[in-house]
Amino acid sequence: MGRDCLNLMRIQLLTTGISALLAASSVSVSLAQQTVTDQYGTEILLDVLPPTTQMKVEETRSVLDSGGGEGPLKVDKLGRFHIDHGAGKGVGGSSGDDEFLVNQLLGIVLLPRPGDVRPDGWPGVEGIWHDFENFPRQVGLVLQSYIGKPVSLGSLDQLVKDVIVAYREGDRPVVDVLIPEQDITSGVVQLVVIESELARIRVEGVDANTEEFIRNQMRVKKGEVIRASEVLRDLSWVNRSPYRKVDMVYAPGYEFGTTDVILKSYQTRANWFYTGYEDSGVDYLGEDRFIVGFNMGDAFGPNRSLSYQFTSDLDFEHVRSNSLVYTQSLPWRHWFTVLASYVDIDSDPIPVGGGNSLDSDGDNIQLSGRYSIPLDGTANRQREMDFGFDWKSNGNNLEFVDFSNLNNTQLFGSRVEIFQFSLGYNETIQHQRGVSQFDIRGIWSPGGFNNHNSDAAFESSRAGSTADYFYFVGSFEHQRRLHDDWSMRFKVQGQDANGNLQASEQLGAGGYDTVRGFDQRVARGDHGAWGTFELYTPDLSLARIGDWENETDSLRFLGFFDAANLGNEDLLPLEPSNYQIGSVGVGLRWNYSDWFKFRLDYGYPVFTENVVTDESGRFHIGATATF
């Protein structure tokens, strides 16, 4: 027994250090100056690493910052350090680690407290024995894999590591696993597993009111065992606001077996004004657009925002658009959004033949509501579903169509009112080198709410359309970092309907946000799809090139290919069955400091079918200044 006890006393020292190191790991990017990311993507407090490893990390960072080559530790392109977690602890460092202590492991006993350990051993146990509630299945599988195998210092050391990892996979992110002094000659090993309890929640980087708000969003309480799924759900909820980014790291508490949760908040500016320009208009309303607006992200308290935007042509004559959006979280962690808009339209004279022309005026009004419900996800996967209702009162279709491609749509006629309901689902997945977004929703209109929501009113605006309809809309977008800081973006959006739709509900293509090189919404359809592929160069900096003092900027060039194929449901005589457009082009994106953004694209049409357009292509310009 003496030799075994002496050896296992050594194991106790080793495994305590290993468990403390892994217990300090975080599940999210955290305090950059105090942590290091290992090759497995785990964020570890630098202070818990062995002093020699800490020195290697600091030396490697210094070499990388100076651009002097490689340091003593290997670092991959994601900035992850290849760390030997056993370094400095003697793990596997001597041939004695592989010497068998017993020839066969018969049983493993898991205990919650060191005081429960029997120093004289626990003979007679076969297999796995424990008295834990909600015992993770992953841990049981790991322990079972060691039963029946020889026991050495090295295998016990690896057992502790594997158990800690299994606990993390089983929703226990912070545990201490110890092998105290004991007699193992019976073939039974006792492990002390201490599931860490919360000591306190520390919030950094915000004022007192926001600190209290963020802390109250974390449902785990002092003295409770930490569950990764619950903590991650709470963190995801806190980060639902676009004006706040909160990162988390676990740190050892003052008492043994406890853990502090540190929340580091990076507040972004929530209240601002902005103005801008873009050439996104349509025929007879002018292509130029002047934009001004404001956003109040926390004026009414956390998780309440109000935004307003005014858009018009440069002469303030043809289009005057007002839109207002209010968003608020609810106590039961759902979201409610209200959107209201009013567009006043007064066009240039429109030729109607015989040398005559006609002025088209009218207004379009919309009031919409969305009720959003976050669904269970993971650290890198957020899911949400929403219910919605739209009321639209359209008195002029010039806002939605290209005059040269009217097809069977009337510019004006009797007023049409739309009452429709929607059900949607969206998902965002964070990958190691990118992000993917998926959205699908169904829209249904029963029709018959009033005289303007009748088949007759719909027919007068769009031949073959009825007030009762149903259509699906789906989109997928993927952005990815490539080699040497190149990146790519791919997006596709599609739609299908059971009949002819009003112009405001059709899928449009053409313009800076769909198919470049064509005018805005030059093609429309009840069904079809459009897609874009973009390839971006690495960042350039005009500030560095021009040696501008105290200024930062980012300039990227891109090449793209855009295409669309659209069609209508119930065709009129001689109406084409589909409309196709496609283009290639180049562009740039320039962000100056944190207040000015500029985009420029030139698209050249490479194919068109049943669409009237300028085949020489066109530029698309947009700029926004924020104050």
Q: What are the roles of these predicted feature ranges?
A:
Residues 12-26:
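Bacterial N-terminal signal peptides
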Residues 8, 29-30:
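A composition/secondary-structure signal for short, hydrophobic, low-basic-content segments
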Residues 2, 18, 31-531, 535-627:
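Immediate N-terminus of the mature polypeptide
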Residues 1-11:
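N-terminal secretory signal peptides that target proteins for export/translocation
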